[in-house]
Design a protein with these regions (language model features):
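Hydrophobic anchor at the beta1->P-loop junction of P-loop NTPases
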Residues: 10
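P-loop (Walker A) phosphate-binding loop of NTP-binding proteins
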Residues: 13, 25
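ATP-binding Walker
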Residues: 16
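Walker A/P-loop
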Residues: 19
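Post-Walker A helix-loop "phosphate-sensing" segment adjacent to the P-loop in P-loop NTPases
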Residues: 27-35, 47-48
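ATP-dependent small-molecule kinase phosphotransfer cores
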Residues: 37-109
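Small-molecule kinase domains that catalyze NTP-dependent phosphoryl transfer to phosphate-bearing small molecules
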Residues: 95-99, 107, 124-127, 150-199
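ATP-dependent NMP and nucleoside kinases share a basic, alpha-helical "lid"
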Residues: 98-105, 113-147
Length: 202
């Protein structure tokens, strides 16, 4: 594993505020590689994964243009931990290898990785990437449920199902180098990010 760049992972559960944190980090001029973005790329028609997903989950995950419909796929797997695990097995290695390529191409000596499900894929990440620090964004469960309802127009039960499909990172904060608590406003969160970057002298 050859790598002479500083890598900081930013992760967090759904509706924790992770994307807002990473957006602010970008605004401060840092490189952020978003693993969700890379996931979009590997789902494109013609990729090996495209055909594997159809074999595994059926053609009902396709839209009218025969593209993978991520909303349909998400709805399918989030209702079953078995199917979610299968999706992760199919996608994670491919995603991480693409991230490694991106890291090598970047000229910056400091790179942030935005990863939704970091703890679930940590062993795989550590196999290919030398992570120097990991930061987690957390928020109270009830607050996250309300954010999902407001943001995605989901009902309460659907929001709870989404949250229950993930490990609760709030219970794992001792495993992280930095914890960013996001229970109030977006402006408060941005201020916390700025203060953390200043404290780290990045």
């Amino acid at each position: 594993m050859m790598q002479n760049k500083k890598i900081i992972v930013v992760c967090g559960n759904i509706a924790s505020g992770k994307s807002t944190v990473c957006r602010r980090i970008r605004e401060k001029g840092f490189v952020v590689i978003d693993l969700d973005e890379i996931t979009h790329q590997i789902y494109e028609q013609g990729t090996d994964l495209y055909y594997k997903l159809i074999d595994e989950f059926g053609k009902e995950i396709l839209d009218e243009n025969s593209d993978i419909d991520r909303k349909k796929l998400s709805k399918l797997v989030f209702n079953s931990k078995t199917l979610l695990k299968k999706l992760e097995e199919l996608t994670h290695t491919d995603i991480i290898l693409r991230v490694v390529k991106r890291i090598k191409k970047e000229k910056s000596d400091l790179i942030f990785l935005e990863i939704s499900m970091y703890l679930e894929s940590k062993n795989l990440v550590d196999k290919y990437i030398n992570v120097d620090e990991d930061w987690v964004v957390v928020a109270d469960r009830d607050i996250r449920i309300q954010r999902i309802i407001d943001r995605n127009n989901f009902d309460y039960d659907t929001a709870v199902t989404r949250i229950n499909s993930q490990l609760d990172y709030e219970k794992k904060i001792s495993e992280f180098d930095e914890v960013i608590v996001n229970n109030t406003t977006e402006s408060d969160l941005i201020l916390k990010v700025d203060e953390l970057i200043d404290r780290k002298k990045l």
